[in-house]
Amino acid sequence: MNIFEHNIKNVDKGNVVAIVGTQWGDEGKGKIIDMLSKYSNITCRFNGGGNAGHTICVGNKKHALHLLPCGVLYENNVNVLGNCMVIHLKTLMKEINNLGNNILDRIYISEKAHILFDIHQEIDAMQETRKSKDGNAIGTTKKGIGPCYSTKASRIGIRMGSLRNFENFKKLYTKLIDNLMELYNIKDYNKEEELNEFYTYHQILKDKIINIMLYINKSIDAKKYILIEGANAAMLDIDLGTYPFVTSSSTTIGGVFSGLGIHHKKLNLVVGVVKSYLTRVGSGPFLTEQCNEIGDYLTKKGFEYGTTTNRPRRCGWLDLPMLYYVKYINCIDIINLTKLDVLSGLKEIYICIDYKNKTTGELLEKGSYPLEEEQLREYEPVYEKFEGWDEDITNCLEFDQLPEKAKKYVLAIESYIKTPIVWIGVGPTRDHTITRKFD
């Protein structure tokens, strides 16, 4: 389905579509972004860095992308790295070289994106080790994301635009690295070697670093089809997620506008990606987590290992109060439900439909969510039980081909969140997707 050509909610068809994860990441955003990228002219990342990971299966080949938008797999697609990204250039160049096929010709990088240096990763590892000793580890990817955003907020970071003038870049680099080495008592750091690497990056990338706000807005006015790709997910948002177990950037729809420099009225459609069960990597509260054979089953059958870290993900039942909250703050128009096939073989499946206060018995107001860990401890999940199904659904091409019990599960989710589920993932590749009609 070419979503850009579809009229939504009786409004004129639009040319700007955003994809957001609705949980703690790893929902399967990469597949739907890949599917829609073949219709778009431009695919954009607006936030985050190499801590994000999209795995895309095309035939028998797997592509793991951490910085590049998924549109790089289509030759007709220009790919943009946005203002609010933090970019480790060694990782970026490795991805570009791995893909080949003149990928660089189709990439633009925001002059306002911040550069993530190796020292940021070193600091990240030091901080996580220290927190682990205190029992307060967040479970970061140690990719340097937090420290890089910290230097950005402290106004001592270096933006991509500075790399165009290498002599000026060297001065900024020396000042930043010396500052961080002194602050974190780092004795041994090879500045000369890293500067040599960055001179190579300067030569390769200087013409790819542009004012992407102007580029995107002119493209919107020219009626180009633009796909906006969210990294991480809503519940990891620095402000609206389960703080402090979050990432360091705005991952919700509000981050799009600063991340790309576009007006909110230019966004036509928001697609929320929902995994059929729930997963989380690292520390943090997880009310529906299943630390039992069910959790083990979901981990193994769903291949729930992090794209970036390869850590096994914590698994549990789908959480609808969380999903409704995320829908509320992102104005989600339609849903892509992923990995329904993983639930095949379970005798019983549960969905959390409410949070109940352990002391008062009161139910949480729909649309709200207790984001602090102490608040969440006051609640317990209220479940609705569904009968499972044994059938292999990976060859189902239409909704009506699904087992009745699987259809009932999908429709229950749709009824609760009052948002149409348009795509249903029933297997790993882009071909394993059911598309439903919607108005």
UniProtKB/Swiss-Prot annotation:
Active site, renumbered: 26 (proton acceptor), 54 (proton donor)
GO cellular component: cytoplasm
Protein name per the record: Adenylosuccinate synthetase
Binding site for GTP: 25-31, 53-55, 62, 307, 313, 339-341, 425-427
PANTHER family linked: ADENYLOSUCCINATE SYNTHETASE
Keyword Glycoprotein included in the entry's annotation: no
EC number: 6.3.4.4
Biological role stated in the UniProt entry: Plays an important role in the salvage pathway for purine nucleotide biosynthesis. Catalyzes the first commited step in the biosynthesis of AMP from IMP.
One term of GO molecular function: GTP binding
The organism's taxonomic lineage, starting at the top: Eukaryota, Sar, Alveolata, Apicomplexa, Aconoidasida
